[in-house]
């Protein structure tokens, strides 16, 4: 199995984290941000864009950009309130009362689980890129007050994204893991989690590696988006009063209002007043209209007074369920971006009478806790025991439509509990078990999780048969219900998945479609990368050509310039016409030309470096004799590319050898590229060649008829006079090597022959010069 990550799938933003070296690390996305907007869109080409790219095109493409879908997961259309339906895109219902999101661009309906799966896949891909290995498993967080249907919908989203969901963990519990991982002492902490779409509050006892949830409460339809909506309504009403136009009826204007409201809410957390300017928000017969106004913090708090009151109720309930008073709370941990609002912080201070702990990042702490839970499951984190609870009560429908609770809310999980039921009529052979979740007394007011029948019960009077019903909740909060007839031993069970709304066939179909989108994304990314690399190659080629021209002159690069310009034009034309085959061919040719250019430049620099370092060596050693390997090994023509000129090899001891100043003979089959012929060589070494002194010396005796030509002067000789081509007699007139201005290094010594002069009588008189 691959790497397991922790994912905070949020209403507004999502975060992914992983355990590395025993510590949780938040992974930044491709845009460099540690949080990824929970936004999915389809642009005008029908391509999928997720995260920040999806958010950027929301104003111009509101009907094909989907946000806040977490609120719709695991719910029926009839469960939605009018406010929750007020989004810029289209929400519709199918024939089974399921929620569908309409995408006009693709002419297709998506389930909320599919949209969330696209976000999860994006996060998993970012984690795979960071880790260098495929991510196959995940621990995903959900609001603590999510019911079983919403939890199962989250698992379905992970499955559609191609992930194995190892654990579903409550967001406040994950936050407590991140906060209390390094806490040694036992503390009672209250986690206040106000996200974009949901609100949760939990009380936990943390210490000695044990995280025990005492109670949890919340509101799955209350979050930061509701505060944004108050600003949207305020702006729309103000504009309606002034211009007689309701901006909420225009999808594009509504999207702009929503973004401006969120920005204003964020700014009011740090300043007392904010400006809201939306030019050209709409147009009437009188022309374009603009929205310009100011919103103060006090006005904002007045707009949201009832929302703050709604925040108080779950806090009171959770303290009551935990059996604690506010003064018994040791720490308050704030989670979610909504907790940055001063009115929310003020509520916590007044209610708990304690300053909130702000040592954790409210946007990242949940994902960090999920990563820790992933480390626990993976064996990387040890000595941690997490005891979570059920957020809502589980029970059965009994006679009269009353709900019988088997598992009260805040029951520690995993848990198994059984109870005995009987028939309601005489000779009843079939019992229908209706599983419910909720806190209301009547079954019709609670959430129906599923139904199943137990048949084969022997006929008997009413109340005689005994049917044992067992509720089994695993660590993920997923419920399995089993009914067993104690008389016959017949048994029937159900794993509550009908609550996920999606059938197994629908989930499999969505998995295949998600894989198709992933393949399209890969192809699109590869195509974009290819186009970007081709354009970058043209810029690189032109830049390199300019550098080489400055170093070696335009004559050196004339043939390369023609090739580079032609191929760059070919690449740009191929990009414009979207001709990939032609683009690949031109790109490969340009890479070849650049390779040859860089190779030729490298050879020229090698020649220069060899001459430079050899000169330094001669300066310090005084060795200017004719065994100079640098010139004896001057390379022959290196390859066909260098112009086909043959310089030959030179023998300083053979006067019949071709002179270096002779024009080289062209070689058959000359290759491409600029010619490095005599003209170029003579340019490079002109001054040096003219300064050399030709000295003809006897070579191994006059009888051989040879001469010795080293063509170079000794640095000790005084050649200031104009007669620089004078031939010196080898034995009598050769200048002394040691006579530097009359004072040799070792005193006045007889003139010595050069190091490479022919041996006299088999002995070199200069062998002991430096010993």
UniProtKB/Swiss-Prot annotation:
Extent of Basic and acidic residues compositional bias: 630-652, 708-734
Cited InterPro entries: ATPase_NBD, Chaperone_DnaK, Heat_shock_70_CS, HSP70_peptide-bd_sf, Hsp_70_fam
Region (Disordered) residue spans: 624-771
Induction: By stress conditions e.g. heat shock.
A molecular function (GO) term: unfolded protein binding
Single GO BP term: protein refolding
Xref: SUPFAM superfamilies: Actin-like ATPase domain, Heat shock protein 70kD (HSP70), peptide-binding domain
Alphabetical list of Pfam families matching this protein: HSP70
Keywords, alphabetical: ATP-binding, Chaperone, Nucleotide-binding, Phosphoprotein, Stress response
Family designation: Belongs to the heat shock protein 70 family.
Protein's UniProt name: Chaperone protein dnaK3
Lineage of the organism: Bacteria, Bacillati, Cyanobacteriota, Cyanophyceae, Synechococcales
